[in-house]
Swiss-Prot record:
This is Gene 32 protein. Residues 184-205 are annotated as: Disordered. Residues 187-199 have a biased composition (Gly residues).
Length: 220
């Protein structure tokens, strides 16, 4: 809805009273809130583990943007080739319309921010594979949810793919969501969010751990 006017004034920018002192807090047309105007708000969850997102009162749409954790880089043995870097976590994106995709009565979205994959251990005798990154998830009452998978860890010798991979950035509904940069340093940890750890390039060196994932919610 573009606006509701009283003469030349858009009432969404005014205070409205019933009588002298009883201030009206909101005006709705059916189930759509038309006053006061809702200010879009971005909420970010960047700590590994469970989270709860409280849906702002008055929001009609919610963009859900998830990024899985990055995989860990492979380690090296004493006589070994360079380890492959971990892959980046994947993106998963959806727009929810309240009253359509989730019930209006649903007030929260819960989920998990995925951890980065474990570093592949290096030693004189063997170079271990890096661990996979954890999935980042979101779900709510009346909605089956969304999952962004974690990146696989580096598990082979690969001298052409030692860097920890970047998930890149995503632009969605004119909002920019930034993923972690590529990790080019030997055995370096992945860059958050979602970056893979680099593989080892020195004998008996461990690979880098993957970076955590992240979840964003843009309400408007």
């Amino acid at each position: 809805m573009t606006g509701i006017s009283l003469g030349v004034n858009d009432i969404r920018n005014l205070s409205i009273f019933l009588g002298v002192s009883n201030k009206i807090l909101k005006v709705s047309l059916g189930t759509e809130k038309v006053w006061p105007a809702f200010t879009p708000v971005l909420t970010t969850f960047a700590t590994v583990g469970t989270y709860t997102y409280n849906i702002p009162d008055g929001a009609k749409f919610i963009d859900v943007i998830l990024l899985g954790g990055g995989g860990g880089g492979k380690g090296m043995a004493l006589a070994d080739g360079w380890g492959r870097g971990g892959d980046a976590g994947s993106w998963a994106i959806v727009t929810l319309e309240r009253g359509v995709h989730i019930p209006l009565s649903t007030k929260t979205i819960t989920g998990l921010v995925g951890a980065g994959g474990a570093a592949g251990a290096g030693s004189v005798f063997s170079g271990k594979a890096g661990g996979p990154g954890g999935n980042t998830t979101a779900s709510a009452v009346g909605w089956s949810g969304l999952t962004a998978t974690g990146g696989p860890g580096g598990s082979v010798i690969d001298i052409l793919s030692v860097a920890g991979k970047s998930p890149g950035d995503r632009t969605y509904n004119d909002q920019l969501y930034i993923g972690g940069a590529q990790q080019n340093s030997a055995g370096g940890n992945g860059n958050a969010p979602g970056g893979g750890g680099a593989g080892a390039q020195v004998s008996a060196q461990s690979g880098g751990a993957g970076a955590r994932g992240q979840a964003w919610f843009f309400a408007y």
